[in-house]
Amino acid sequence: MLLQRLDFLLPYTVKRLTPADVDEILALQAKHSEYHQHYQTSPVTKADILAELETLPPKALPEQKFYLGFYAQDELVVLVDLVLDHPQANCAWLGLVMTEKTKLRQHYATKVLTALRSALKREGYKELMTSSALSDVNAQAFLNAQGFEQGMVTAVYDPKLGHDIQVVLRGIEL
C-alpha cells in the first residue's frame, strides 16, 4: 500500500529496487563521493550496493525494508532506503535519501520526503527517524531544512572505516 500511496502523491514513478537494479543505483551513488567519504575509505562498488539492498537493522525482517527508486521520465532521480516498524512499532527508519547529482537543489528529495511523510502518516506511523554522520554538513543542513529534530550525538562503529564515527540521531513526528 505504501508504494501505491507514494505513486499517487508524487509526479514520479516509484519502484521497489532489487539486485537487478544495481548498475542504475551504482551510477547514481558513485557521483556522491563526498557522502561516501563519511562512511568508507574507497569509492562505492557494486558489492557495496548489493549489500545495502540486503542489509537489515537488528530484529528487522526483509519485508520491512523498502529500497525505493523514484523516476522522473524514466530517469532515477531519488533513492530512499526505508525500514518500517524500526526501531519500534509505528516508527519508520530512513537509512538513506540520495538525489541524482545533476538534480540537486531542484527539490526532488524534498518532494519525495514530503510525500513519504504523508504516506507513512496515512499508514498509521507516528515518527520518521534517521541518523547521519556529524561530519556530513550537507546532510545536517538538508535534515534541518526538512524539519528533523536533532537528537543525541553518539559514536557508532563503522566496519568499513575500522573506527567509530559520530552520528546525529534525528526524528520528525508525522
Name each region found by the language model.
Residues 121-132:
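Conserved GNAT acetyl-CoA-binding A-motif
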Residues 100-102, 106, 135:
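Active-site acidic-Proline motif in GNAT/NAT acetyltransferases
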Residues 113, 137-138, 158-161:
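Short glycine/proline-centered loop/turn elements that form peptide/ligand docking sites
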Residues 107, 124, 147:
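Short glycine-rich hinge loops at helix-strand junctions in the catalytic core
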Residues 131-132, 144, 149-166:
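Conserved catalytic-core motifs of GNAT/GCN5-like acyltransferases
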Residues 110:
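Residues forming the Rossmann-fold NAD(P)(H) cofactor-binding site
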Residues 79, 133-134:
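Short amphipathic helical patch at the helix-1/turn junction of helix-turn-helix
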Residues 2-12, 16-22, 27-102, 113-115, ...:
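Acetyl-CoA-dependent GNAT
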